[in-house]
Amino acid sequence: MKKAYELTFIVRQDPNEDVINDAVNQVQAWVEAGELGQVTKIDRWGRRRLAYEIDKQRDGYYVQMDAEIDPSGLPELERNLKLSAQILRYLLVLSEK
């Protein structure tokens, strides 16, 4: 049974917008892999200054996704997010919807 989750992540800032778009598309593909999840909304917050430096980065590109995900697919999704060089930080929480 799928549950509603909110995924917020910070993409490493890059002057080339295609790199950011590729990272967002990759995360969406991870969520939807094996039909374990479905992205319902993507909200791009844009470039923001970080509160503190992460991996020598002062700025990041914030993205928030709403998704319906089967809990059995969460470990693989979190593993991919942790191992991605483009994702600085992420937060995955159960939505209150």
Language-model segments: residues:
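Long, contiguous binding/interaction regions
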Residues: M1-G60, Q64, E68-K97
